[in-house]
Amino acid sequence: MIWSDPYLVIRRVNILLSGIDVVPFNTTYTDALGNTRRLNESMKAEARFLRAYFYFELVKRYGGVPIIGDKVYELNENIELPRSTFEQCIKYIVSELDDIKDDLRSLPLPDAAASAHVVNTQAAQALKIRVLLYAASPLFNEKPIESGNGGTATAARMHE
């Protein structure tokens, strides 16, 4: 994986997020709890999941990276963003996953075939656990248990 590939995906997600509400489609679905939801809200949440996932892939390889947020830069635009710290990146990823959890679909979905290609609440929770465990690991935290940073304990409690 090279540096630019994840940012290309992040840019495409930002383009989708900036334009999805312009497209008029009123498709709804019924979630596992019987609530009626708008499909475009789930699509936005799934796109934000992908953005969080690709930021995590960048952070695993490079440590802190520039965070673009929702901004859509033009392809020929000169972008000079400061590199965010590792902690800022982890907080951004976790906040993205926390923000989308209520808009993602929950298992089981009515159509088993459709379930294979849907980012659901459980996937977001699993990624959040992985991010927090990675952040609390000795690779980035010399004393993961003794330091009291809460990362290890928070990740361990996520399964509840």
What are these model-derived regions, one by one?
Residues 27-37, 64-83, 139-160:
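Short coil/linker segments at helix-helix boundaries
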Residues 44, 51, 58, 121, ...:
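Structural register within alpha-helical repeat arrays
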Residues 57-66, 108, 131-143:
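Short coil/turn linking the two alpha-helices of tandem helical-hairpin repeats
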Residues 64-66, 114-126:
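Aromatic-lined, polymer-binding surfaces characteristic
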Residues 1-62, 78-91, 95-116:
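Conserved, well-structured interaction surfaces
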Residues 9-10, 14, 125-132:
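Well-ordered alpha-helical segments within folded domains of soluble proteins
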Residues 98, 127-133, 143-147, 153:
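Internal, well-ordered domain-core segments that constitute the primary functional module
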Residues 21, 63, 69-73, 97, ...:
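Short, small-residue-rich loop/turn micro-motifs
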